[in-house]
Amino acid sequence: MTAILNLAVALLAGLLMTRIFSRWHLPDVTAFLVTGVLIGPFVLGRLGIPGLGFASYDQVEALSMISDVAMGFIAFSIGNEFRLSQLKKTGKQAMIIGVLQALAALAFVDVALVIFHFLRPDVLSVPAAITLGAIATATAPATTLMVVRQYKAKGELTDLLLPIVALDDAVGLIAFAVSFGIARAMDSAQFSLASILLSPLIEIVGSLLLGALAGFVLTKLETMFRSNSNRLSLSIAFIFLMVGLSAVDFTVAGVDCGFSPLLVCMMLGTVFCNICPLSDDLMNRADKWSTPMLAVFFVVSGANLRLSVFSQGVLVLIGVVYIIARSAGKYCGARWSAKAVGCDHTVQKYLGIMLLPQ
């Protein structure tokens, strides 16, 4: 009962906050995140009044399943950006920019935090600095997609943005696995090249294969139904199914592996939109159906913020260095690579800024 009440409060409070933020011309995502902080355990939730907020992080965690499913819908929707007709126009540019800007962010953060280590070795170790550099490669697909949807943005910049955000996940998986493996080797003096390379490779290839197979099966099953409502229900069921299957872990050659729910659902959407003649209508319907779920996702994300970390000045300083270095890496990497592949000045100027959310 508490979880249902918190779910209702999160959605209602988030929607009401968007009306306030719209006066300042701020996106709904910002309103949802601020709402989450306000009704989270550190503000109104601290009062312990039922229906006023999340009294504990356990209550926030109780809604984590909604967040997982919301990410599945986001990835499914991003898959729609990989239509073959569109990839013929921007695919090469998106691939080059996507890889280079991610590597630039990794390099900038690694250098900045390693320098910080030499200044304060008692606070930040080199393995931790390297791991944070790998995390810097990723861009938040949920934030990007929701802002694009809200403002109905279209054009060359948007056409490049969403595929690049999608590629970030694959690049981030490899970068994190390699960086974390190096960091672990530095800590324990054990280095396994197989585990560093095999795990992300299996995760990426396995996720893409699972998503592609599911997209093919979904397309075949859609032809069995004549009702658009039933077809929509089938699409939604497959997204839930992929999110659930992505939680399965397995071992290959002694290496622990798993699936990436983002890549699985993204590939599901990519295959579905390219081979199913009904995909346009069904994906639009799925987007509308998932809108309340995305709102709850961002409110829960805000409620998960641990405000107690701001009481530790050194951690705040590390965070500031990380944000500045990552922002510089994303912006410079996107600008330089966009110029190298011949994008127009508008793309060169603004693409890096649009890749800052994490």
Language model: regions and residue ranges:
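Membrane-interface alpha-helices at helix entry/exit sites of multi-pass transporters
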Residues: 90, 96, 153-175, 191-194, ...
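Alpha-helical transmembrane segments and their lipid-water interface positions
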Residues: 35, 44, 48, 71-75, ...
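Membrane-interface junctions of multi-pass transporters
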Residues: 39-89, 222-231, 241-321, 343-346
